[in-house]
């Protein structure tokens, strides 16, 4: 009786130790060579995935690494596939007046 009780306690301890040994969610987990919520672009640079993580609504004004449609911050692709600047985005009032 004593041996089976000790065996049961040891089994429970092993189960709890296994559960605790599982890795926790790591905000810096590496996916494809980049940190969480980032991917490598064509030039091999890690860029942020729009809408990933706590920023559910893309904030074009605060994150310089946000990529929208393959273009960098404050730029979008035109019908030819070229990246063109979005007027009013960022802080360049001189260019916006053009």
From Swiss-Prot:
Organism phylogeny: Eukaryota, Metazoa, Cnidaria, Anthozoa, Hexacorallia
GO cellular component: extracellular region; nematocyst
An MF annotation (GO) of this entry: toxin activity
Species, as recorded: Metridium senile (Brown sea anemone)
Membrane-spanning parts: none
Signal peptide location: 1-21
Propeptide residue interval(s): 22-27, 63-64, 92-98
Protein name (database record): Peptides MS9.1
Subcellular location: Secreted; Nematocyst
Keywords: Disulfide bond, Nematocyst, Secreted, Signal, Toxin
Top-rank lineage group of the source organism: Eukaryota
Main location: secreted
SS bond list: 34-46, 37-52
Family: Belongs to the sea anemone BBH family.
């Amino acid at each position: 009786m004593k041996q089976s009780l000790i065996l049961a306690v040891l089994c429970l301890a092993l189960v709890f130790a296994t559960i605790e040994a599982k890795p926790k969610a790591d905000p810096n987990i590496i996916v494809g060579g980049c940190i969480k919520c980032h991917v490598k672009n064509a030039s091999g640079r890690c860029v942020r995935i729009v809408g990933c993580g706590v920023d559910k609504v893309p904030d074009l004004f605060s994150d310089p690494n946000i990529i929208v449609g393959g273009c960098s911050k404050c730029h979008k692709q035109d019908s030819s596939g070229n990246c063109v600047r979005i007027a009013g985005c960022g802080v360049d009032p001189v260019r916006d007046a053009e």
